[in-house]
Amino acid sequence: MKLLKPSWVNHNGKPIFSVDIHPDGTKFATGGQGQDSGKVVIWNMPPMLKEEDEKNENIPKMLCQMDNHLACVNCVRWSNNGAYLASGGDDKLIMVWKRSGYIGPSTVFGSSSKLANVEQWRCLSILRSHSGDVMDVAWSPHDAWLASCSVDNTVVIWNALKFPEIISTLRGHSGLVKGLTWDPVGKYIASQADDHSIKVWRTMDWQLETSITKPFDECGGTTHVLRLSWSPDGHYLVSAHAMNNSGPTAQIIERDGWKTNMDFVGHRKAVTVVKFNPKIFKKKQKNGSSTKTSCPYCCCAVGSKDRSLSVWLTCLKRPLVVIHELFDKSIMDISWTLNGLGILVCSMDGSVAYLDFSQDELGDPLSEEEKNNIHQSTYGKSLAITTEPQLPNTVIENPEMLKFQQRQQLQQDGEHMVQAQMEAPIHNMASMMNGESLEDIRKNLLKKQVETRTADGRRRITPLCIAQLDTGDFSTAFFNSIPISGSLPGSMMSSQSNQQLISLDSNTTSSSGALKSNVELVGNNTKPAEETANKESGNVSSSSPVAPTSITAQPKIEPMKALDSRFTERSKATSGTAGVAHLNQTAVDRLKEQNVTKDSKPRVVESSSDSEEKIPASKQLSKRKGEADADLAEKRKKGRPRKESQRLMSVSLTVQSQVASTSEKELTCVTTSSLTLRLPTPTPQKSFTLQLSSDPSMYIEVENEVKTVGGNKLSQLKCHREGKEWEAVLTSRIVAAAGSKEVVCVACEKRMLSIFSGSGRRIFPPIILPSPISTLQCTGSYVMALTAAAALSVWDVQNQNIIIKNESLQPLLSGNDLTVSQTLLTKRGIPVLSLSNGKAYCFSPSLSTWSLVSDKQDSLAQCADYRSCMPSQDAVMCSGPLAIIQGRVSNAGRQAAHLFTMPHLVQKETTMAYLENQVAAALMLQSSQEYRHWLLIYAQYLVNEGFEQRLREVCQDLLGPVHRSSDSQWESRILGLWKRELLKELLPLIGQNLRFQRLFTEYQEQLDILRDK
């Protein structure tokens, strides 16, 4: 045996908590404490093995250093195929690293010395689930799973083929879990914790097989780690830190019956780490000795807090070798080379030691074929042989399940082939660019250097940056491995503002397609666009050209796009004035800050046709010429309303108990002593324009009182559609308008609603509304009118019937200071109102009631954690009205789940309730794609958590009756989707868990019977 303690392997005096040798033996990794962070270092193995390589300066010793962990790294482990490195630390994270093929070394960031990263390793995935320090990680024998344990008392099983998917979370320990080891045949995983127990879990169903406590009753939680190990033949599990007659031991646990009759004794302090040699040995046959085959045996290394290392052979009663005082502090980790003749040991004192054995000392190692034969003869064949994330050692009971697995295997093979074909051109392109090698490119770049001469004749070369060239093997960007579904709705909201056409009159300019700001510059003053939007061309107080007015209609677009971040402009278009405005919360807050700007006083304008006064809801309404002097007086008193406003409000038919701030530009609910609701109404403008769709050639123009016939003034409506134009004349001034590709509707002063077809044909006689219009919207062939009396109506113009008739908002606006911040009419005619308290309601015509579909303060959304059930990151994100209503809430809820520590049962219940709410809300909104999206996530969660009863109920509802019956009330479709087609999509999810193979088979067979019929 040879012993070496290389001084060049160190963490600058900081502790090294873990070490692991790469399967190919060319490198090894260490993990521990760095400078203000955790540190993972990959070292070159040849300088450790040969003295001449250590002295050769051309052979690098350090290959790469990664300081991405925010806190100390407790464990590093290579995958069995050597492609990945997993590291876990005190920052509660597990990072999975993969080599990236950069050319040339790079300096270690932040290093004062000239350290260079010869190899480039990038973070492939970051696994977040633990709420405490990660103490140990372990790859399954065939790299299908990655297990991690933590001081949060849990063990998490990750799907190594589909990070960051969680297969299962093992709960049962009542103390800090400090060590993990896999059964070499893949049937069990064992964990050791400070609760004086080792628990063995079945990988078949991730349930507890046995709990071993007796050898650990006298133990205390004095060790930093408890690294236990399973023998390569699978017969023995050896624990760390056990006690026998008050003496520290390493307990030997037999697989057969989990008996604890033997142990490794001799260490003076607690055992911290046990590591079996990966090879199975047999005694070396000497020349002339008996040809009788010897019994195979295993080799085990034991490290302790007494700073000593012992190496044992299971065929001997005493240790093969004991090395005392090998380090200054406790031994933390041990790793064997793949050939079984070398061993690396690390210590808390920040150093490592390498022991090199010979075959004469350990014996002849068995070949891999002989080792597999031992496994097969002892345990039989196992599903663990496959790389599928299935449950090993589970009997497949029927051919349908077997066929399903084979189809999945073929599908994955096809995906890998396509991926390989896509990566091949990348590698070729990286190695050769335009026929030149990368080295030629570098030389050509150096030839292009810029050289100048200074005044004194000296040369000066301008520095030229030569970027690193990646030869491929790209990996996911750092901190970007968790899908954020909430980002898409947010981006859609911000991108929809280009679907607006700005109101025009003779002195205004047009703007369409560009992204508008909420604030426009007028002269030298900065004012909100809405503030200057409604000034008429005849306003004598305006010294600069009138700014474009932000008035648009509700175009016919997808329901999810109907609510966007520029909803203020859209709703003002439907109401005909900036007086009725709907802002998202961000815009509201921005406008609140400008509450003291000029011309921000509330204006109350008396209607010329109705006796009901208008309630102020904007910073400035349309001005008449005679009011210019009054405006100058108002600017001197910025905190008080005009006397005229006070007089008009005092004679209002409803006695106002509260009026919301007019700077908030929201639909304001005014509560009264008689509980009568009043919503703000728009004031007629001289002219305005609104766009019908994203096509800028489709828009309508409104001009009030442009013609005089017999002493009566008429208003004109013009519609421009695909190069064609039609006109309509109305006898009253138009106060609000809305339109889509199918329908154009306008509301006039005399409470009349006129509806026209896309070609200009009047569909109905003027509809008399019960009170003046407050908000008018149109989507497809549906028209929604919200009146000043807080009554909502929705008509189906195509079928000429009413869907919702004068439904009161009283149940929604019963609280104080509640306002309507957003409105939405889906493409199926479902109205949705979003209130200032963050709650959103929709009205169901079938139930004749309001339903809560979203709540920003919902604790379920904040605590639910269903990330492992989300579609992959490259999947098309779900879009629809529910996603737009909730906006970024769902993303915030998933991120907040990491900040809350709660019992698993509580989190499971909250996640279940949240997903069921999402499915029900999508169904209420009649959003078919969102219903399918959330149903699949819900089903995946049921499969992951093992809720068979609810899963069966979902499947039964989708399957329906197998035999036809005249009195059956079952509907074969839901929201236009075939239920049995949805069931076909659910079955592959169910098939992922072999515990549900009978459920899978049951419904698969019934679908086959129905198909044959």
Curated annotation (Swiss-Prot):
One of its GO terms (biological process) is chromatin remodeling. Pfam families: Beta-prop_CAF1B_HIR1, Hira. WD repeats lie at residues 11-53, 68-107, 129-168, 172-211, 220-263, 266-322, 326-367. Residues 558-572, 589-604, 624-634 have a biased composition (Basic and acidic residues). GO terms for molecular function: nucleosome binding. Keywords: Chromatin regulator, Nucleus, Repeat, Repressor, Transcription, Transcription regulation, WD repeat. GO terms for cellular component: chromatin; HIR complex; nucleus. PROSITE patterns: WD_REPEATS_1, WD_REPEATS_2, WD_REPEATS_REGION. It comes from the Eukaryota. SUPFAM superfamilies: WD40 repeat-like. Residues 529-648 are annotated as: Disordered. Residues 535-553, 573-587 have a biased composition (Polar residues). InterPro entries: CAF1B_HIR1_beta-prop, HIR1-like, HIRA-like_C, WD40/YVTN_repeat-like_dom_sf, WD40_repeat_dom_sf, WD40_rpt. It is found in: Nucleus. Required for the periodic repression of histone gene transcription during the cell cycle. Required for replication-independent chromatin assembly. Interacts with histone H2A, histone H2B, histone H3 and histone H4. Belongs to the WD repeat HIR1 family. This is Protein HIRA. It comes from Xenopus laevis. The lineage of its organism: Eukaryota, Metazoa, Chordata, Craniata, Vertebrata.
